[in-house]
Amino acid sequence: MRKWIAGLVVLTTALIAAVPTAGASSTTCTGELAPGSYHKLIVPEGAVCGTEAGPVTIRGGLYVRAGATFVLGSEENPVHTGTIRGGVHAANAMSVQIHFSTISGGVRIRGGSGPFGGPFGVTWNTLEDNVINGSVWMTGYTGFWEGFFRNIVHGSVNYNDNTLVDPDGNEVQSNTIHGNLNCSGNDPAPQQGDSQGSPNVVTGQKTGQCSGV
């Protein structure tokens, strides 16, 4: 599943997408995200926003609304792509995919918008090869697939109640977590899957469904 998903990450959206709102305190993104610096970045309901290239700096937090898709970076382009301060906040988003970035302020990805739809036909969340300063919450996702790979997290990771269509989903591997790794209520249970990853290194405790990964 990992190889198939990686080949799908091609944005097919408008070329002009980042539109500053009143006072330029926030930017609404509905297509290709141009390299540059932004304050608060908002992906509105049902929109698609992203870039595989960068570099992008977000200083006031990233907010992904219901049914929206956000992509930053690519597994095939292993260079530092983004810096996000103020955290990542997603509520019932369709897909959130962040690669090779530094995130300060933690990650809160809650809920989903079902397994099918959006620019890729199927939905998935993945956080890969990031440095995350702050706790991570990935909870209640109802997409097709979800993964969490090779991240360095300065805080605890809470991975709960994610129900996926793909039996190879909920792959949580090769992370270094300076805190606890807490997992419960996921279907399927967090696993290696076909990722060829390694067990997570956790300085705190591994609890629940993640006690063996």
Protein language model regions, located:
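Feature marks extracellular polysaccharide-active and adherence modules
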Residues: 44, 59, 65, 73, ...
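C-terminal region of N-terminal signal peptides and the immediate post-cleavage residues
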Residues: 2-31
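A recurrent domain-boundary module in secreted/ectodomain proteins
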Residues: 13, 200-211
